[in-house]
């Protein structure tokens, strides 16, 4: 789920934090990609006849085709992708996982009813909801990426948190995912729709955390509390408080504790034993690999290994796979020049703290002046 309604909140309250980009804008960038999100997107991309791609043995291969060609498209555009895979879910996510299990059961029931009625459109809708990435599909994609020379990171817990950590350490430019909680975990840059199908021509949305905080006049702590009020994967929300009210309350009261002290809890009842403090801690200190333990190396692809795996084992067309590999090699060679602005790089970590540092300096100046606000310059008497 990520953070419920956060993208719209940012669009409403911090529009300058969002840039609409074409993929070529990221030439020379290293990008950490939420692999699980990608695989899910590839698997729900059902073909016109309502089926997924399969090998001769009846194995689903949509995930391999999607990963292979989308990765090559990124390399064509000078992007150096890093795929980050989910580890075990945090204990606090158990409630959200239970809800997902319930929704799957409801979707299975609805699918059966749609098939009995002969409603193909409804059946397709519920089939998409039942798609789940398997362990085997994860392993096959890791094998393919290894053969392509693309670095893979296996997060101990949430992929978005690990991606955010790589961004904060300056190892990559941004996090590519559809889940907005990458910002809550501290990713300075979030890219949505980077892996959207080229044919759909969906523009990439680039969110900048520093601009969000600056324009909304929030600290990082206040932003995390806002995200918890909006709705995250780790705890419930206060009934009756929507996005507009959540923003108002955080701006007025600064944190959830003070919000709870000042709202009418008969009108806005919080969940019983609401673990918002633990959710806050999880966003502040998620379980991630230390960045000095993560080595990102892009290697030459093993063309024959790819052909053996994709064509020999998974029945893809050898001509198409070899043609795509020729294209990939050309793009790799062309992409070695890098970005001009890399010669003038300020690390992502520095960019993220600039706003907070500037605010602290402004507060210090106010204290020196006795908290007085400077007004407009007085006109000189004629």
Swiss-Prot record:
Concerning PTM, the database record says: Phosphorylated. Phosphorylation upon DNA damage induces relocalization to the nuclear plasma.
The record's GO molecular-function terms, alphabetically, read:
5'-3' exonuclease activity; 5'-flap endonuclease activity; DNA binding; magnesium ion binding; manganese ion binding; RNA-DNA hybrid ribonuclease activity
Q: What EC identifiers does the entry list? A: 3.1.-.-
Q: Where is this region: I-domain?
A: 122-253
Record note on cofactor:
Binds 2 magnesium ions per subunit. They probably participate in the reaction catalyzed by the enzyme. May bind an additional third magnesium ion after substrate binding.
Residues binding DNA: 47, 70, 158, 231, 233
Q: What is this protein called?
A: Flap endonuclease 1
Native source organism of the sequence? Caenorhabditis briggsae
Taxonomic lineage: Eukaryota, Metazoa, Ecdysozoa, Nematoda, Chromadorea
């Amino acid at each position: 789920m990520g953070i419920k309604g956060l993208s719209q909140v940012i669009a409403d309250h911090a529009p300058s934090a969002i840039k609409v980009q074409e993929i070529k804008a990221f030439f020379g960038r290293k990008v950490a990609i939420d692999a699980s999100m990608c695989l899910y997107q590839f698997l729900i991309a059902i073909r016109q006849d309502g089926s997924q791609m399969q090998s001769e043995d009846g194995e689903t291969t949509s995930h391999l085709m999607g990963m292979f060609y989308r990765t090559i498209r990124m390399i064509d555009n000078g992007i150096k992708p890093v795929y980050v895979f989910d580890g075990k879910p945090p204990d606090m996510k158990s409630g959200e996982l239970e809800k997902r299990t319930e929704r799957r059961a409801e979707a299975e029931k609805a699918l059966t009813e749609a098939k009995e009625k002969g409603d193909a459109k409804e059946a397709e809708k519920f089939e998409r909801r039942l798609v789940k990435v398997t362990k085997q599909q994860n392993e096959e994609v890791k094998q393919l990426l290894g053969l392509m020379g693309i670095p893979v990171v296996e997060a101990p817990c949430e992929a978005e948190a690990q991606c955010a950590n790589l961004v904060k350490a300056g190892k990559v430019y941004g996090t590519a995912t559809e889940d907005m909680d990458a910002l809550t975990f501290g990713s300075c840059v979030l890219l949505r729709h980077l892996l959207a199908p080229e044919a759909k021509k969906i523009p990439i949305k680039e969110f900048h955390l520093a601009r969000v905080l600056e324009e909304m006049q929030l600290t990082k702590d206040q932003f995390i509390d806002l995200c918890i009020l909006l709705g995250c994967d780790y705890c419930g929300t206060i009934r009756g408080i929507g996005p507009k009210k959540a923003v108002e309350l955080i701006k007025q009261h600064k944190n959830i504790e003070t919000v709870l002290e000042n709202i009418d809890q008969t009108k806005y009842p919080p969940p019983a034993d609401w673990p918002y403090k633990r959710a806050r801690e999880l966003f502040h200190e998620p379980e991630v690999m230390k960045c000095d333990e993560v080595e990102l190396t892009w290697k030459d692809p093993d063309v024959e290994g790819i052909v053996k795996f994709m064509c020999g084992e998974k029945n893809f067309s050898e001509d198409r796979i070899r043609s795509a590999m020729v294209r990939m090699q050309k793009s790799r060679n062309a992409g070695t020049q890098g970005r001009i602005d890399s010669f003038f790089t300020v690390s992502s970590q520095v960019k993220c703290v600039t706003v907070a540092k500037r605010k602290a300096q402004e507060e210090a100046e106010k204290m020196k002046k006795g908290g007085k606000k400077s007004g407009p310059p007085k006109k000189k008497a004629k």
